[in-house]
Amino acid sequence: GGMGTSGLLNAWCPFTDGEKIIYKGIAERVFSESKKGVPHIHYDNWVPINGEYLKVVYDDLVTSEGVSVLFFTTMAAVEMKRKGVVDAIVVANKAGLSTYKAKVYIDCTGDGDLAAWAGADFVIGDESGSVQEGTLCFTLSNVDPYEFSLIGNVHTNRKDGPIHSIYGNPKYPLVKDKHMNDKLIGPGILGFNAGHVTVDSTDPVSYTHLPSPR
């Protein structure tokens, strides 16, 4: 849920094979419910994500099943009973450090932190350790709907799109490729997914001090 909400990702990757939805279960339920937050969209691939609406969808899914939620709480450590068996997890929030025990632990960290810290085997990146580059997601509000309707979009596919004059311009040395797509999230709100940055999301030093562009 983090990428579609706090991560500001602007669209779902395709859920269909071109004819029908192929992801079922919880995935389809989340997708179908989240589409209600973008009622202006009438297609099923690359559907915009209304992050604020998606938060409610996720909250409703877990609370309707009786789950007690703690916002702004992060897993801090794993305590092992023995090799391969988790005894407890330690979480951190404004109340400090707290320990929780359960019969079953489900890793929802996104990066597999619980499994990795518990000693599970894992692989990061390619043979050299390089990982897929991240993109920069952001939103713009108070966009004039009339002016935007005249433009349509600023996607890279448009030969007259602004990214083509930005890329290679010495004024913007951090822009190292032409990746740019935008989605109309709601009235006067555009969501963007643009550019790439060389960063390892599992390394705090990496995403705090981004390397210089190639």
Label every model-predicted segment.
Residues 76, 96, 112-113, 145, ...:
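Solvent-exposed loop/turn segments at secondary-structure junctions
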Residues 96-104:
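Core beta-strand elements of the Rossmann-like FAD/NAD(P) dinucleotide-binding domain
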Residues 107-151:
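Glycine-rich loop(s) and the adjacent beta-strand/alpha-helix scaffold that form part
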Residues 192-195, 200-204:
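N-terminal leader/propeptide and maturation segments of large enzyme subunits in energy/redox metabolism
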Residues 208-213:
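Conserved small/polar residues in nucleotide/adenosyl-binding loops
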